[in-house]
Amino acid sequence: MQIYLVGGAVRDQLLNLPIKDRDFLVVGATAKELINQGYQQVGADFPVFLHPVTQQEYALARQERKSGTGYTGFVCDFSPNVTLEQDLIRRDLTINAMAQDLTSGQIFDPFGGKTDLANRLLRHISDAFAEDPLRVLRVARFAARFHHLGFSIAEQTLELMQKMTACGELNHLTAERIWRETEKALHTESPHIYFQVLRKVNALAILFPEIDQLFGQIQSVKYHLETDRGQHTLLALQQAKLLVKQAHNPTALLWAVLCHDLGKDLISAEMLPHHYQPNVTGIQLTHQLADRLKVPTAVKELALLVNKYHTNCHKIAELDSERVLELFNQLDVWRKPQRLDDFLLACEADARARLGAEYCSYPQATLAIDYFNAANAVNVQAIIADGFKKQAIRDELNNRRINIIKQIKNAI
């Protein structure tokens, strides 16, 4: 029995990057032998074994044979006769198909992973890559993760990804797997690259048609030097990435920014850019996308609010006090003040996603916080003590909040 460190841990070690997870491969052993040594088996389809001391995961070497459509259509062989190279060849990219002997430290690299690391190249190992449609998303995610290091996708790999898209294999992916890869991609160093790659291989129109239709939609040059709405969205995503450490819910912030302009291309030209009324079409599209991918509720809710109200936030200094209070009520900031922070970050990312405005301040956020702090300080108990009852309490609370917002507005 031989044990190897495999996959991302070997790759990241060679790139001098922090190693987050360590995956171990066992060659020349059976499940029974591992169990007899104290390993605990977890999982049925792809058995993984927990080390009796470290609780780290160990997997038996395996071969795979395509038996159907989608990423689940495989027959696996876990026999002790499966070699290290036979296991590694089933992996997606050469840089993920290296193994390190735990005893000697020697690195096995049968497919040129080291060379591709040096050349900053994401390259598939063989045509068997096409057997798993999820790999289209995975490669896009790796491109997003390593873009800042200068990595690009090999032309042959891009061509194969395009063929996989064209043959309909992506239609077999479940919502859960699409969202899982996308959420990981959002938290890479360059999430916009994920969507650029998917668009380049024609997968964006299949997986994210609501996002794809933003590309080619022309914006007013007066307000957007980057006239394509899709490009503006990706610029906004880059800006959100710079702000994400301030977010209470980072995933929600990034997803909201991605969805903030959905449907805007369907608003009449006369209303742009001053369309302060809710974008009903955008709300529908944001709902549709989130529901199809089974996006978590909190993530979906912020995206809906940002899509609906971000233009109001940009013009908050021009809104009357009643509309400011209405905005706060719609955001439910009294019960969820952290949501206001993330909403404002999303609006700031949008405002800065204009060529030449990348490092501009966003005073609207400061004003919104001032309005909120003052309005939130209104004492409900004082209203009750003044004799107001039932619905009159709510009405008076709104009136006092409006008045204090008005005082701040008049003092500006």
Curated annotation (Swiss-Prot):
InterPro entries: CCA_bact (IPR012006), HD/PDEase_dom (IPR003607), HD_domain (IPR006674), NT_sf (IPR043519), PolA_pol_head_dom (IPR002646), PolyA_RNA-bd (IPR032828), tRNA_CCA-adding_enzyme (IPR050124). GO terms for molecular function: ATP binding; CCA tRNA nucleotidyltransferase activity; cyclic-nucleotide phosphodiesterase activity; magnesium ion binding; phosphatase activity; tRNA binding. Its cofactor is Mg(2+); Ni(2+). Transmembrane segments: none annotated. CTP binds at G8, R11, R91, R138, R141. Residues 229-334 form the HD domain. Keywords: ATP-binding, Hydrolase, Magnesium, Metal-binding, Multifunctional enzyme, Nickel, Nucleotide-binding, Nucleotidyltransferase, RNA repair, RNA-binding, Transferase, tRNA processing. One of its GO terms (biological process) is RNA repair. Its EC number is 2.7.7.72, 3.1.3.-, 3.1.4.-. Comprises two domains: an N-terminal domain containing the nucleotidyltransferase activity and a C-terminal HD domain associated with both phosphodiesterase and phosphatase activities. Monomer. Can also form homodimers and oligomers. Catalyzes the addition and repair of the essential 3'-terminal CCA sequence in tRNAs without using a nucleic acid template. Adds these three nucleotides in the order of C, C, and A to the tRNA nucleotide-73, using CTP and ATP as substrates and producing inorganic pyrophosphate. tRNA 3'-terminal CCA addition is required both for tRNA processing and repair. Also involved in tRNA surveillance by mediating tandem CCA addition to generate a CCACCA at the 3' terminus of unstable tRNAs. While stable tRNAs receive only 3'-terminal CCA, unstable tRNAs are marked with CCACCA and rapidly degraded. This is Multifunctional CCA protein.
